[in-house]
Amino acid sequence: MRPVRGIARSRILSCSWRGTWTSALTILYLGVYCESTTVTPTTVEDTTVSNGNHSDASRNNTVIRNLTASVDFSQRKLYPYRICSMSMGTDLVRFARTIQCVPFNPRVNSEEGIMLIYKRNILPYVFTAYTYQKELLFQRSYKYVTYDYLLGYSREFVALPMWEIFLVNSRGQCYTSHQRVIGADRYIAYHNDNEVNETMWLMRDDMGNDDTYRYITVKEHARTPGSVWLYKETCSMNCIVTKTKGKSKFPYDMFVLPSGVIVNISPFYNGSNGKTFREQREKFHIWSNYSILKDFGSRALEARIVPKMAFYEREDVVIGWEVNDQSNVTCEMILWETVDRAIRTEYENAFHYVARTLTSTFVENKYSPDNNLTEDDIKCFKNDAQKKIEEVFLRDYNETYDMDGNATYHVTTGGLVIVWQGLKQKSLKALEIAANESAVSATGSNSRRKRSLPDESTGDISYAQLQFAYDTLRTYINQALGHIAEAWCLDQKRTAEVLHELSKINPSNILSAIFGVPVAARVVGDVISLAKCIEVNQSTVLIKGDMRKFSDDGKLEGCYSRPVVWFSMKNSTEVRLGQLGEDNEILLGTHRMETCQTQDYRIFVAGDIGYEFQQYVFTKKINLSEIDIIDTMIALKTEPLENIDFKVLELYSRDELAQANVFDLESIMREYNYQKKRLDFVVERVINPIPPALKGLDEMMNGMGAIGKGIGEAVGAVGGAIGSFIGALVTFVTNPFGAFVVFLFCVGCITLVITVYRRQRRAMQRPFDYFFPYASQTITSSVADSSIAVAYPGPEGTSGDAPPPYPGEAPYGYKDLSVDADTRVSSSSAGAGADFNEEDAVRMLRAIKRLDDKKRQEIEKSSKDSASNKNSETRRRPGIMDRLRRRGGYQKLNTEDDVHV
């Protein structure tokens, strides 16, 4: 096949000459048309070609007609307008080269009958399974003043306890809490952190497929934000119950779920039947007459009774399934082909079963131990085989044949099981019965009998003649059947060789003739690549009436070897170019050119009409009935035998091979996509913790030798520590809570500085009032058991804040407030005019100390009396000595307090 530019060399699956073509093959051909020139032909039937610059007189004022080529409906079914050009097919086929024909042996016996061929069932056992689990979603967040930050989450799947599974299967509900015991500690998680254990209804999930139904309690996970400047971790709980399909493959020692979960337990294990069990037995439970809901999402609570229900507990899921009897739900063999007419030939060591419709011979070794099939081996398909044999017999053989014995079961060398039901013609069956009865009557009695009549003797001779006739007929029939079978086998072998060689010349025509439909074929090495042709829109095919090609300036460039056609694909209005091929095939492209001949005459067939071209220009239409046919068919006087078409044997179809694997990729990807859609993705940034400066310093130090490397490590360690410390500070400050603490600390420091500054300023301005507040107050003293109230007024018109008078001097304006003038205290007795000595100073300090102790006691007493008042609290006033020793932290005394000396 000639390759065409633009064809994508990709193999497209699921396309064969017998099956349905997928859209992928259409896409393949659309890729071919991408390089085709898209034109819009004129809608008129006749087009006048102008002369232009061409000097050929034959082109002047020539009327060229574009022909609408229609195909008759009878021919359209076999050879419609189609495209068969492709670089690579989708199926690979080859001719059988190892056909073995056993020569006829007159001593072998051949018989005809009905043959059923059973193959091993590779499809897995499919059953309903349930999974029970809870999804715990823990979400950590931080609440700021105006924003709520989601910091992360963790998802965990846990198995439901068995007591809660009973609630799910009976009520369609599950609880909003989950308890886990780790060591001696018990942990309980609640849905939405509400600290209440309630029940939630199951409902159908939106995501699912035909084989998997998922029931959940929560469609969207909720999250409760925390308080301002605090972290909070919330829990959202979702019960997930899945009704899906489990698959187990022969020998049924494990099964697989669509989610990829593998359980190493036979689905038929019931606890005592000896089936495979490779899991923890304490986690396995089985119940009889178990009640389970048909639909967990329905409030109708319609249940069904399961004879045996098994559950297996795992850490993250509980798996349940119905336990059935293996002999009732599975069969190791499955019917492959039914051969209505077959021939079995018996040889010395084997039986050969010839299936004419399959063009195959199946061999059974007589002495192979594998041929001994037990009743248990055929139990699962014995009844079906008997019904099928009776159906074929009543349809095709009831009037002319009888069954020869019962059906027998045989195993071929390829592992197939053949059910053989021998047939015998009714006339031969009657002769055989008569011969057997004659033999029985001849040997049935040894007693002496009365001489028979002459006609009885004649009857004995006729029985012998019948027996001889039967034996002779059987021999001739067996010989005829043997020769026919051998000749038929040799003919098929030679035909296969001839077709194999012819396919190297034109594989498309040979394969089209074999399969009876137009196909595109190409020899690829020692095999043939096969694909089906694509039909175009039959009503849009238009043949160009001119096979000459001119340049833009009107010069003749050459001539097309095949007529140019316009066409459109189905369900498309885009017009494309091609060339007309044999049997209505459209060849893609217009590159098939040749040198123009002067006296050219050609006829091209499209449909049931011939189109005549002279000098590469269409002249007229020709009826094909006017052209004689070369008849190569030699008609037989007898009825011809049925034609035998080659058939590609497929022991297992593509669907069976796809379903044979327990790991269904499509189901696994659906389950994966379901889980993926439910995930919340968090983007993380990866930051290099090493600063670029330290990294450059380390590289520089490494170049200075061992000493530099050591210094670099020390500097790097110190720099790393400093960087970590600074990073910690930056992290603390950038944290909202840390920033608030720093702000409060700064405000406190500023307040403390202002307070200290004001105290120091007041002490500097009035130090005597600050350190000795008692001096500016009214003094009450007791001297010599006499109470004298002394006031120290200042000059007239001034306040009484003046200091006491010096000894020996009468203060101006002072007067005795408690006694008469005669009894006034004389200042001379106190040593008027003399300075205070050290002893006087000591007595004054002692007096101040006694005054300080007295005031302190009064303050303590006053504090105890006012402790009952909750609205005010008076702090203990420090004494004078304390003020002198610790001048900081003084508090100003009240003006109404008295000082007693």
Swiss-Prot record:
Protein name (Swiss-Prot/TrEMBL): Envelope glycoprotein B
Gene3D superfamilies for the chain: 1.20.5.1890, 2.30.29.100, 2.30.30.1230, 6.10.250.3280
Gene: gB
Intravirion topological domain: 758-901
Organism the protein comes from: Guinea pig cytomegalovirus (strain 22122) (GPCMV)
Glycosylation-annotated residues: N53, N60, N66, N197, N270, N289, N328, N372, N398, N406, N436, N537, N571, N623
Residue ranges with Basic and acidic residues bias: 852-864, 872-883
Post-translational modification: A proteolytic cleavage by host furin generates two subunits that remain linked by disulfide bonds.
HAMAP family xref list: HSV_GB
Region feature (Hydrophobic membrane proximal region): 683-734, 714-734
Compartments where found: Virion membrane; Host cell membrane; Host endosome membrane; Host Golgi apparatus membrane
Transmembrane spans: 737-757
Chain spans, region Involved in fusion and/or binding to host membrane: 141-147, 226-233
Disulphide-bonded residues: C84-C533, C101-C489, C174-C239, C331-C380, C559-C596
One Pfam family this sequence matches: Glycoprotein_B
